Amino acid sequence: MTAASTTATTMLQATQSDVLQEIQSNFLLNSSIWVNIALAGVVILLFVAMGRDIESPRAKLIWVATMLVPLVSISSYAGLASGLTVGFLQMPPGHALAGQEVLSPWGRYLTWTFSTPMILLALGLLADTDIASLFTAITMDIGMCVTGLAAALITSSHLLRWVFYGISCAFFVAVLYVLLVQWPADAEAAGTSEIFGTLKILTVVLWLGYPILWALGSEGVALLSVGVTSWGYSGLDILAKYVFAFLLLRWVAANEGAVSGSGMSIGSGGAAPADD
Ligand code: RET
């Protein structure tokens, strides 16, 4: 065994306590995690209060999907804070940090698999879209997150990290297509186009920030440190999750009549029944 591989093995066998120590000694990284835990806690309480009078099934479904966003988030950040979903990865030859053990908060990519479908479910219900379109957006989104996780975790080949990044981007394009082309027309027909338009722009602009950060951060070309990258994601999360969800819930609570269908009209091709 060479000296380099011995060091690598040592770090790769780091215990959860070692990882925790490393997180806690990195102020930027640690604060980016704890600020989000605190915010998610406040947001959960706020959303419970905001949704307490919502009665119609479709509006309720939007509310539950929206509530799940900070609920998944607080669990995700608690996983990162404890070191459970953070590990050391030895970057492959060709990577800017080749041979070094880089702290990877991979749990983020894993938990996006659960939070981002909730954002899309809420948006799809708001637009009163059809089930095929909703299924497409959610499955493409899950594909994006899982292949993004693969891109972050691959240590055998630099090229394959970027191949998976490319696959993830292709899934992302499908999500963007649904959001930008299909759902605006559904929202127009459902009478929710104003709020949908605002949330669509917020979502598309902020979501584009994630692959850019990935590419610039330590997973990609390593122009940004682990702490700065983590604050980047945390900042995007605050806007793409809490601000997004707040705007959506505030609108739903004030305009329940506009989303008062059964919540099961999904599959009807977006057309609401006449007596809806
Ligand atoms: C990755 C890297 C690979 C390429 C692409 C990505 C996109 C990620 C996105 C994440 C959105 C996350 C949100 C989380 C809220 O809980 C995986 C970074 C395209 C769009 C909104």
Swiss-Prot record:
Coiled coil: none annotated. It is found in: Cell membrane. The chain crosses the membrane at residues 26-51, 58-81, 106-127, 131-154, 158-180, 193-216, 226-254. The modification N6-(retinylidene)lysine is found at residue 241. GO terms for cellular component: plasma membrane. Keywords: Cell membrane, Chromophore, Ion transport, Membrane, Photoreceptor protein, Receptor, Retinal protein, Sensory transduction, Transmembrane, Transmembrane helix, Transport. Residues 22-25, 82-105, 155-157, 217-225 are extracellular. GO terms for biological process: phototransduction. It is a multi-pass membrane protein. It comes from the Archaea. GO terms for molecular function: monoatomic ion channel activity; photoreceptor activity. Its main location: membrane. Residues 1-21 form a propeptide. The keyword rRNA-binding does not apply. Residues 52-57, 128-130, 181-192, 255-276 are cytoplasmic. The keyword Oxidoreductase does not apply. PANTHER family: BACTERIORHODOPSIN _OPSIN, NOPA (EUROFUNG), PTHR28286. Light-driven chloride pump. Belongs to the archaeal/bacterial/fungal opsin family. This is Halorhodopsin. It comes from Halobacterium halobium (strain port).
